[in-house]
């Protein structure tokens, strides 16, 4: 929305952000489908998120994404409810701790965990990395204050260092948002060598 020069289109984009985020807030941090049930992946409610053991990546991912979404909605709408809910999740429900958890601590759920947590942590899912990184824009750029921005920077760099061997262009480009120390040559290599038939 901030890159759109045409006012009607910008207004429409901001309205969509607002409507989606208000829906999630109104539905206790669930994205509810036409049947009245939460979608499979649209679950940011503390009861759901914190039911995952600390080492299960979805606990970190869902915390990071919802804070990014709330910050983005606040940035574009100025509605206090989004800021209030973000701080509530961070301070009353541990979402800041969740999203700051180092990547080296993320792994398989213990044998005592519920079946859903075990399934979520059976293997590393590349699409989860994409969800993290796409959310990092709103997490970092629209941070409510410099203290949070510094923490988010640390979390993003920690994630990048974990993913660095992949030489993924997207990870490097997004990391350049928070640090001058990223692999520009690797990003160029990835973009030049990535098979076009996979697009």
Give the location of each predicted region:
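A surface/extracellular/periplasmic glyco- and lipid-processing/surface-interacting theme
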Residues: 3-35
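Ser/Thr/Asn(+Pro)-rich, low-complexity disordered segments
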Residues: 22-64, 71-199
């Amino acid at each position: 929305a901030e890159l759109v020069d045409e006012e009607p289109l910008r207004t429409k984009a901001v309205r969509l952000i607002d409507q989606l985020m208000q829906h999630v807030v109104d539905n206790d941090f669930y994205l509810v489908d036409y049947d009245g049930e939460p979608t499979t992946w649209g679950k940011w409610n503390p009861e759901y998120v914190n039911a995952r053991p600390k080492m299960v990546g979805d606990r970190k991912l869902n915390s990071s994404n919802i804070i990014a979404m709330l910050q983005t909605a606040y940035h574009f709408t100025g509605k206090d409810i989004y800021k209030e809910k973000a701080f509530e999740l961070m301070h009353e429900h541990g979402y800041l701790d969740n999203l700051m958890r180092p990547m080296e601590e993320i792994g398989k759920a213990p044998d005592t965990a519920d079946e859903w947590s075990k399934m979520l942590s059976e293997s590393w899912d590349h699409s989860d990395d994409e969800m993290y990184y796409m959310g990092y824009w709103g997490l970092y750029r629209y941070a409510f204050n410099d203290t949070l921005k510094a923490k988010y920077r640390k979390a993003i760099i920690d994630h990048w260092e974990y993913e660095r061997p992949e030489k993924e262009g997207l990870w490097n480009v997004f990391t350049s948002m928070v640090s001058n120390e990223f692999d520009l040559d690797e990003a160029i290599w990835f973009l030049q060598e990535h098979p076009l038939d996979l697009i």
